[in-house]
């Protein structure tokens, strides 16, 4: 729960994203998963969703594996599908396989409450981990 920005930074979000990319470039991992929480103007919207860079074949495969695990292990009533994207900073700037996992919507009161519990956080982590294993085992 710690941002990768200086407390005095004028734009904390931008600095956080830049530092995430710098870490990825420095360590050159096989894959990267960036964990986030979503928001939307409609408080009824809920559920985890995984994003990948639209032209990344491997990113899409990883996103689908993680999304499937999230939908199954969290018993999502209306499962979301992965979404390709070309405008998110992390997806545009990463040279490797990277997905963004939006664990849920903080603007949905029920989901926001669940996201704050250790039990649910561990379920989300287990689902993401299972999705990564599924992706790697298919390689």
Regions found by a protein language model. Name each.
Residues 1-61:
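Catalytic-core regions of hydrolytic enzymes
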Residues 51-54, 69-72, 118-122:
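Short, low-complexity, polar/charged sequence segments that are solvent-exposed and flexible
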Residues 22, 27, 34, 41-42, ...:
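Active-site-adjacent mobile loop/cap segments within catalytic or ligand-binding domains
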Residues 19, 68, 72, 113:
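Charged/polar, solvent-exposed surface patches and flexible loops
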Residues 59-84:
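Active-site-adjacent substrate-binding region
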């Amino acid at each position: 729960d710690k941002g990768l920005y200086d407390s005095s930074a004028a734009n904390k979000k931008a600095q956080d994203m830049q530092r995430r990319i710098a870490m990825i470039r420095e360590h050159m991992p096989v894959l990267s998963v960036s964990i986030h929480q979503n928001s939307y103007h409609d408080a009824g919207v809920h559920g985890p969703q995984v994003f990948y860079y639209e032209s990344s074949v491997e990113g899409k495969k990883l996103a689908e594996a993680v999304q499937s695990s999230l939908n199954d292990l969290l018993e999502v009533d209306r499962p979301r599908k992965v979404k390709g994207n070309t405008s998110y900073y992390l997806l545009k700037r990463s040279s490797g396989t990277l997905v963004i996992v939006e664990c849920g919507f903080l603007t949905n009161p029920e989901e926001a409450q669940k996201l704050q519990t250790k039990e649910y956080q561990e379920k989300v982590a287990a689902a993401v981990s299972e999705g990564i294993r599924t992706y790697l085992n298919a390689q």
